[in-house]
């Protein structure tokens, strides 16, 4: 990495510290040069780059100042506390870095980005993804990696296409990813719910299901489950893979937040798969921004031809500009730095939430079950007593400016719903979490 880029990153970290506010003046060029032991020309280049990214602005004969963000409340009144939205925080979107990558992609690939690509994806991006996946214990040949328009497209194709096992039903965790639930029910695909809790899965029940039902694949989120926020134990993962091989059931592993994992011993299901029964899905939308509709699917050899045929019918290619920009973003190291920033942000919010719940639960009856779960994670949940419906709590808190969302849409329509209150922290400012939790606890 060039010196000025290293310095740029350190200045950004300094700007994000609690001692600096928007509109504050940065240390002088001379002071920055002395502090970081670099030349003045390196400091100037780093500051100029930050200015290009609209993070700072210069005042002649005065210095550089931190840009004030637009969209702040001018009334000084606190806005709603949004524990409902699961999209990533817009304040941490890497807009400017990715804009640079888009411009660089156009300069590099020129006309190639504006003609039809290939259904499989941009070959240079696939090569970069193969290396990235290998760092996460997903060792795959390039011919098994497909670029899709997000995980949602991959799921749609997998639901539609026939599998080598000749089976028809799809098993899905309950509660589970709401858009997958919606897809199964809208398309009338036979689906069977599998209970998922903080403790994981009942492996004995999963085995009976695989034995007695015609299960095409089991869709699961082993890490950072949406909406529960918990992860499967390594033992459960190994047992799932064993059962998949024994009963010829495929596992569709949605690892949408795998980049948040801090435990180096926590591997994806794919790492345990020796019989080619795991389909691995990766997304960038929750780590970067929802509008980046680029995902990856890693498929066993037996599925690649069929997936390719269905993908080609579904669309000619995923956005070539987005693919090329993502390739540059990954190769440049920007994604690695952004990932650390996101991980730190969610970890701080998760820990603040867990601490606030423990501290303030006595404000109400305290009749709920809560596991502190994992940090960092966007999601967590409370198990409420049956005489306190989650819908009632949500309605009362909405009147006080605290937004929560019912969990019903995470269940199949014929599956018994539990009285759970899901909580997302991705769009709640750290300083608002305690106030929101106090209001929540007072209604429980």
From Swiss-Prot:
What is the gene called? ycxD
Keyword set, alphabetical order: Aminotransferase, DNA-binding, Pyridoxal phosphate, Transcription, Transcription regulation, Transferase
Return the protein name. Answer: Uncharacterized HTH-type transcriptional regulator YcxD
The entry assigns this protein to a family as follows: In the C-terminal section; belongs to the class-I pyridoxal-phosphate-dependent aminotransferase family.
Q: Name one GO biological process term.
A: alpha-amino acid metabolic process
One function term, GO molecular function aspect? DNA binding
Q: A Pfam family matched by this chain, by name?
A: Aminotran_1_2
Could you tell me which InterPro entries the record lists for this protein? Answer: Aminotransferase_I/II_large, HTH_trans_reg/aminotransferase, PyrdxlP-dep_Trfase, PyrdxlP-dep_Trfase_major, Tscrpt_reg_HTH_GntR, WH-like_DNA-bd_sf, WH_DNA-bd_sf
Write down the species: Bacillus subtilis (strain 168)
Superkingdom, natural source: Bacteria
In this chain, where does the modification N6-(pyridoxal phosphate)lysine occur? Answer: 286
DNA-binding region(s), residue ranges: 29-48
Q: Which residues form the HTH gntR-type domain?
A: 1-69
